[in-house]
């Protein structure tokens, strides 16, 4: 069931969410359970926006990205009045290596998902401004389903690379106790790695842990 999967996603990945993001998602779930669907959608959207805001703010500049533009992105993400629009821009920005100058995407995510996000944003606007558009459980569940499938896969470096780095750190005794379980990382594989990347992931995993 979509709602139960979303609850599980949030509960099992609290360490990846800051207090504000976690609170927004938890409040969204409470509203959904109470049948308050407009607010449930709005809070889930805000939670996702905060999640993207944080991962971009905490990331290193993507390879090939213009430093001045990166500084501008970071400044807007820190501004409470500008971050929402900047998050949307980050999501929409596609790579165009043949452009003049070449364009580097900030977020590693499917272009189809970038295109779909205009729909999600429009529904957010419907919720926020109480427009005539009827927001019901199906809209909230559709958004939850998208989050279940893609949220942890979306990073600046890509979900696969991010998870490989976490595995590398987990097997490094200078960073992680040998007694610490890697099961939480194993549980993230299906959430963060696209099926088409699995072979590359396991090749990378062998390389990342081979020095041990």
Mark where each language-model region is.
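Charged alpha-helical initiation segments
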Residues: 1-40, 172
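Short, mixed-charge amphipathic alpha-helical segments
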Residues: 13-16, 78-123
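Short alpha-helix boundary/capping elements
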Residues: 48-56
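Short, glycine/acidic-rich hinge or "gate" loops at secondary-structure transitions
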Residues: 59-68, 165
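Solvent-exposed, non-transmembrane interaction/regulatory regions
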Residues: 72-73
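Charge-enriched, short contiguous segments at helix-coil
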Residues: 103-162
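Polyanionic, low-complexity intrinsically disordered segments
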Residues: 142, 149-212
């Amino acid at each position: 069931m979509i709602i139960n999967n979303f609850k599980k996603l949030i509960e099992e990945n609290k360490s990846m969410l800051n207090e504000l993001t976690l609170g927004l998602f938890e409040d969204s779930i409470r509203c959904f359970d109470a049948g308050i669907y407009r607010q449930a959608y709005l809070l889930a959207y805000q939670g996702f926006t905060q999640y993207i805001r944080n991962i971009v703010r905490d990331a290193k500049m993507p390879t090939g990205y213009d430093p001045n533009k990166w500084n501008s992105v970071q400044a807007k993400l820190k501004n409470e009045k500008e971050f929402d629009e900047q998050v949307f821009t980050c999501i929409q920005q596609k790579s165009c290596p043949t452009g003049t100058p070449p364009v580097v995407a900030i977020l590693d995510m499917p272009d189809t998902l970038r295109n779909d996000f205009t729909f999600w944003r429009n529904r957010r606007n419907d919720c926020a401004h109480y427009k005539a558009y009827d927001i019901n459980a199906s809209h909230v569940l559709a958004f939850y389903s998208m989050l279940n499938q893609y949220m942890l896969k979306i990073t600046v470096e890509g979900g696969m690379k991010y998870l490989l780095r976490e595995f590398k750190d987990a097997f490094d005794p200078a960073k992680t106790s040998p007694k610490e379980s890697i099961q939480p990382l194993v549980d993230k594989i299906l959430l963060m790695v696209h099926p088409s990347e699995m072979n590359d992931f396991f090749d990378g995993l062998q390389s990342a842990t081979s020095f041990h």
